[in-house]
Curated annotation (Swiss-Prot):
Source species, domain of life: Bacteria
Any Pfam family hit: BamE
InterPro entries linked to this entry: BamE, BamE-like, BamE_dom
Alphabetical UniProt keywords: Cell outer membrane, Lipoprotein, Membrane, Palmitate, Signal
Chain coiled-coil ranges: none
GO biological process, one term: protein insertion into membrane
Native source species: Buchnera aphidicola subsp. Schizaphis graminum (strain Sg)
Family classification: Belongs to the BamE family.
Lipid anchor positions (N-palmitoyl cysteine): C18
Lipid anchor positions (S-diacylglycerol cysteine): C18
Name listed for the protein in its UniProt record: Outer membrane protein assembly factor BamE
Length: 104
């Protein structure tokens, strides 16, 4: 009987969505400059980079359009040093390489 209880507990532990090994900490902050990309980050030329390199630099896009090979990111554009105006960065790919950056 005790073996069945131990086996049952082990099965519940193994098949539950909880994990002891994975311990992620998510930090939420109200600082917009840290939450969004800043336009200063785009002074570098990203043309010719692969999708994997762009994901390594910017992280996963908020939306990726697989039919048109476009990644979309939200960026922060400061206006006269006061506040943050949200803009959308569109990164276009041709043959898995960056062909164009568009900020709207």
């Amino acid at each position: 009987m005790s073996n069945q209880i131990v086996l049952g507990m082990l099965m519940i532990f193994l098949f539950s969505s909880c994990s002891v090994l994975e311990n992620k900490h998510y930090v939420l902050n109200n600082n917009l400059n840290e939450s969004y990309f800043n336009l200063n980050k785009f002074k570098k030329n990203y043309k010719g980079m692969t999708k994997e390199q762009i994901i390594y630099i910017f992280g996963n896009p908020i939306i990726s359009d697989s039919f048109n090979d476009v990644f979309h990111y939200i960026i922060c554009a400061e206006e006269n040093g006061f506040g943050c105006h949200q803009k959308i960065l569109n990164i276009f790919f041709k043959k898995n390489k960056v062909s164009k950056l568009d900020i709207r």
